[in-house]
Design a protein with these regions (language model features):
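Rhodanese-like catalytic fold shared by cysteine-dependent sulfurtransferases
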Residues: 2-65, 71-75, 83-120, 126-193, ...
Length: 273
């Protein structure tokens, strides 16, 4: 009898342990998936980080998708997102000139103007943040009327007619939530001495980063040449990125693409507040 009770008690303890592990594992898995989705989905919501960079003296003109559709053949859509975003899904016939190129590459700006011709220019990104910066830059140099689709993705996806002007997937980045997640690291025991800050504007880091060298690299605002030169300057130690905002966390995915294109890898990211 006592043997049976001991066996049952042992079985109960083991079962409880497995159940606890399953629950903890499930919570961790959910947290990882939720975090990945937040990182990717962040570009569908406007960010104060971009608005701080906008020139208040250089206003832009917002336009509705309904106005574009009504005069479709007289508009050209300039998609200022990253190539991976553009290749995943885009407005039909749109041109892809990423924001960093338009901000820093005069040849890219002139090529875009030449391709657009006499058509009215509409700058597009999912939320209107990057497109606002691009439109402001182009208007200051070339003049003309440059439109921005404010929350353009939402306008398109909420209307059956507008969706016919979209081609490809509605996922923001390749792989969606199934994309292999970049490891999230802790400062304790971290041997890398250099961390990459991907935020749009540099700001002092929290005290837990004391003793680390912080390199500011806002890749969404950098040209292709600037990004490649920066990556070429990195040493041989693991590449670790800081994720301290929606935009910088989103940028970790883009940074990872660029590293992989250069035969490197993003070893991990550290979240700070």
């Amino acid at each position: 009898m006592n043997t049976d009770k001991a066996t049952n008690r042992k079985t109960l303890i083991i079962s409880t342990a497995f159940l606890l592990l399953a629950v903890v594992g499930g919570v961790v898995f959910y947290a990882e998936v939720k975090d990945t989705l937040q990182m990717v989905e962040s570009e569908r919501q406007k960010s104060s980080e971009f608005s701080r960079l906008a020139d208040p003296q250089q206003p832009v003109h917002n336009i509705l998708m309904s106005d574009i559709v009504a005069d479709w053949n007289n508009f050209v859509i300039i998609d200022v997102r990253e190539p991976e975003e553009y290749n995943e899904g885009r407005l039909k016939g749109s041109l892809n000139y990423r924001l960093g190129e338009l901000l820093n590459n005069e040849l890219a700006r002139r090529n875009m103007i030449q391709q657009a011709g006499e058509k009215k220019r509409v700058f597009y990104c999912h939320d209107g943040d990057r497109s606002t910066l691009a439109a402001s830059r182009i208007e200051s140099e070339f003049g003309g009327t440059n439109y921005v689709m404010d929350l353009g993705f939402r306008q398109i996806q909420e209307n059956d007619e507008y969706r016919t002007y979209w081609e490809g997937s509605t996922d923001i980045l390749p792989g969606g939530k199934d994309y292999e997640r970049t490891p999230v690291l802790k400062m304790e025991g971290l041997t890398a001495s250099t961390l990459i800050d991907l935020s749009l504007q540099y700001k002092p880091q929290v005290r837990t980063l004391k003793g680390k060298t912080i390199i500011h690299a806002p890749i969404l605002l950098m040209s292709d040449a600037q990004i490649n030169a920066f990556i070429a300057s990195l040493g041989t130690e693991p590449v670790i990125a800081l994720c301290n905002s929606k935009v910088s966390c989103f940028s970790t995915r883009i940074f990872r693409y660029r590293l992989e294109q250069n035969g490197l890898k993003l070893s991990g990211l550290i979240r700070t507040k």
